[in-house]
Amino acid sequence: MADEQNLDNQNPETPEQSQADVAEDLAARVQSLEEQLAAAQDQSLRVAAELQNIRRRAEQDVEKAHKFALEKFAGDLLAVADSLERGLELSNPDDEAVKPMREGVELTLKLLLDTLARHQLEQLDPHGEPFNPEHHQAMAMEESTHVEPGSVLKVFQKGYLLNGRLLRPAMVVVSKAPADAPPSIDEKA
């Protein structure tokens, strides 16, 4: 009993002080839990936003994969179209012996180009257009008085777009202004 009295004398707290301490502890605990809740809610929002971004990126990747899946295959077919066009260029349209073969090649080329167009492959034939470095590759420059400088004079190889994206640039010859001709002998005199 004496020990209990000594303990009571050592802790001379009143019940009001004890309740105040408990209230402070509870208030601190509530504040700590509110901070943890806010942090958890913030983390939950960030995770939800990240999931939405991942889902959106995955959808875009799938869309691009579908859109450009034909890129390699279409690129390989362009050599076939080029060969058919060269064959037509080199054959004489007036030669009766090759006329049926020429018509067959023309129909085959038309069928191939129509098929490519159905799959959003667009042919670029820039003859006479202004040079566009985004769609054309200049192979040479040639002086010309017939067209404006910077225009496409000749097309060595047609270019192609797949779904609006450049698959192959057109290989072209670009015009340039003629150099001033040296004065003739008559002009010197």
UniProtKB/Swiss-Prot annotation:
Primary location recorded for the protein, binned into one broad class: cytoplasm
Polar residues composition bias: residue spans: 7-20
Disordered: region residues: 1-21
Gene3D superfamilies given in the database record: 3.90.20.20, Head domain of nucleotide exchange factor GrpE (2.30.22.10)
Gene Ontology cellular component list: cytosol
Subcellular location(s) of the protein: Cytoplasm
Keywords from the UniProt entry: Chaperone, Cytoplasm, Stress response
Oligomer status and interactors: Homodimer.
Similarity-based family: Belongs to the GrpE family.
The protein's role, per its UniProt record: Participates actively in the response to hyperosmotic and heat shock by preventing the aggregation of stress-denatured proteins, in association with DnaK and GrpE. It is the nucleotide exchange factor for DnaK and may function as a thermosensor. Unfolded proteins bind initially to DnaJ; upon interaction with the DnaJ-bound protein, DnaK hydrolyzes its bound ATP, resulting in the formation of a stable complex. GrpE releases ADP from DnaK; ATP binding to DnaK triggers the release of the substrate protein, thus completing the reaction cycle.
Full protein name: Protein GrpE
Species, as recorded: Stutzerimonas stutzeri (strain A1501)
